[in-house]
Structures are given as C-alpha cells and as structure tokens.
C-alpha cells in the first residue's frame, strides 16, 4: 500500500464518489478510472516537471461561484419556509443531514462512519445494513446523499448525531446548539 498526497478539493471529490461506507480510496479510484480490480497498473515514471501554461484572464469569462459559507447555509436552512413547514422532528433531522452533506460530503462521510452507538450502527450506505443492526431501526434515506440513517431513536439521540457531525465539520458551538435545538 502506497501513500500519496492530494489537495483538499480532489480529496473531497473522491470522497463524494463513495458508494458505500467502507469503500476504500483505491476502490473508488479504480471505479472512476474504469480499471478492473485484476488489471495490472503500469508504473508511471516522472522524469521532469512540467509547468502549466499561464492563462490570461479574459473579460468574457464568468466568475467562479464563491465557496459556500457553512454557517450561513445552515442559518438559511433554519429560516427557510421548507424547513419551517416540517412538523415532524424526523423530517427536520433528515433535512439537516442532507444540508450538512451538501456542504462538505467528505467530512460528513468520515464522520458518519464513526458515529454509532454501543450496539447500533446509525449511518450506512444501504437500508439492509441498518436493518441487520436492529429490526426496529426504521431506516430512511437521507435525500441527496448515498446514506441511510436510523430514525426510530429519540430526539436527543438525533441531536447527538447531528452535533457529532457538525463538530467534525468544525461548526461553532453556538451554531451547533441552534441547529440541534430545532430538531
């Protein structure tokens, strides 16, 4: 097993291509590069470094969209009509998880893999995995993500799951409290 360094943007992209929890980076890259698992990989020898050509800024180019501000996005969610219309805590819980995933899928994925109970798995890439960890878990798909989550836990447990993910995503404590307080 070799280690390579990649930039954060590429890491987030690779992590966003995860199809199931536990899928290795090698598996994801093989799938993205359309390599067969048994296909030998030709060694690459780098003999010289090549500098990228300088590109002149053209007036017709559209500006790149600014990076999302996670705190602002969460505040907008809490103030949105779609969120306010949700009467069930489980629906608000799912919408929060969906938004968190859209903000930083790589960190969400890492965090979801580590958040679990003493005997229960809370997040999985498929419904069957959650059903196997308990018959009464009531798994639900998190919209816009490859994840499923248990939903028959009490509200405090749901808050703890969201809190753990938001902490891993480095949200400020006061923002975490605001979001968790709305579940």
Curated annotation (Swiss-Prot):
Interaction with DNA: region residues: 118-122
Stored InterPro entries: Arc_rbn_hlx_hlx, Ribbon_hlx_hlx, SeqA, SeqA_DNA-bd_C, SeqA_DNA-bd_C_sf, SeqA_N
This protein's GO CC annotations: cytoplasm
The keyword Cell cycle is assigned to this record: no
Top-level taxonomic group: Bacteria
SUPFAM superfamilies: Replication modulator SeqA, C-terminal DNA-binding domain, Ribbon-helix-helix
Pfam families in the record: SeqA, SeqA_N
Keywords for this protein: Cytoplasm, DNA replication inhibitor, DNA-binding
Biological process per Gene Ontology, one example term: negative regulation of DNA-templated DNA replication initiation
DNA-binding in keyword set: yes
Family the entry assigns: Belongs to the SeqA family.
Name the record gives this protein: Negative modulator of initiation of replication
The species this protein was found in: Proteus mirabilis (strain HI4320)
Gene assigned in the entry: seqA
């Amino acid at each position: 097993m070799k280690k390579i360094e990649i930039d954060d943007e590429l890491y987030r992209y690779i992590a966003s291509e995860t199809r199931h929890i536990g899928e290795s980076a090698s598996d994801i890259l093989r799938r993205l590069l359309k390599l067969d698992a048994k296909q030998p990989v030709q060694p690459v020898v780098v003999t010289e470094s090549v500098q990228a050509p300088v590109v002149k800024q053209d007036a017709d180019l559209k500006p790149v969209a600014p990076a999302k501000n996670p705190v602002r996005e969460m505040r907008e969610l809490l103030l949105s009509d779609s969120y306010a219309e949700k009467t069930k805590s489980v629906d608000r819980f799912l919408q929060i998880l969906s938004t968190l995933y859209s903000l930083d899928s790589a960190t969400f994925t890492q965090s979801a893999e580590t958040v679990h109970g003493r005997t229960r798995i809370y997040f999985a890439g498929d419904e069957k995995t959650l059903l196997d960890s308990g018959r009464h878990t009531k798994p639900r798909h998190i919209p816009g993500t490859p994840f499923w989550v248990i939903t028959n836990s009490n509200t405090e447990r749901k808050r703890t799951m969201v809190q753990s993910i938001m902490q891993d995503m480095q949200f400020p404590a006061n923002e975490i409290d605001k979001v968790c307080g709305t579940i």
